[in-house]
UniProtKB/Swiss-Prot annotation:
It comes from the Bacteria. The keyword tRNA-binding does not apply. Its EC number is 7.1.1.-. It is a multi-pass membrane protein. It catalyses: a quinone + NADH + 5 H(+)(in) = a quinol + NAD(+) + 4 H(+)(out). It comes from Rhizobium etli (strain ATCC 51251 / DSM 11541 / JCM 21823 / NBRC 15573 / CFN 42). The lineage of its organism: Bacteria, Pseudomonadati, Pseudomonadota, Alphaproteobacteria, Hyphomicrobiales. Belongs to the complex I subunit 4L family. This is NADH-quinone oxidoreductase subunit K 1.
Amino acid sequence: MVIGLSHYLTVSAILFTLGVFGIFLNRKNVIVILMSVELILLAVNINMVAFSHFLNDIVGQVFALFILTVAAAEAAIGLAILVVFYRNRGSIAVEDVNMMKG
């Protein structure tokens, strides 16, 4: 059985849909929203690598590595901000994060 482009696009579409549903259905927990954004970025990376492979172009794979780097930094910074916010306020609910002073 040969894994074609349609298989990669199907998996990517499923991951993207799960990420969007995670953002829209869970509006109370910031950690779940961050994980949903990571799922969306993973779906984009799968698309880039799949098209790069099937078009015999390396640029998509290199760009996917840059996206993975930015996604890892975004997750680390986001979780660090949430830890500090939880220590100060005792909650990481979206309603509490929206009321930040700054």
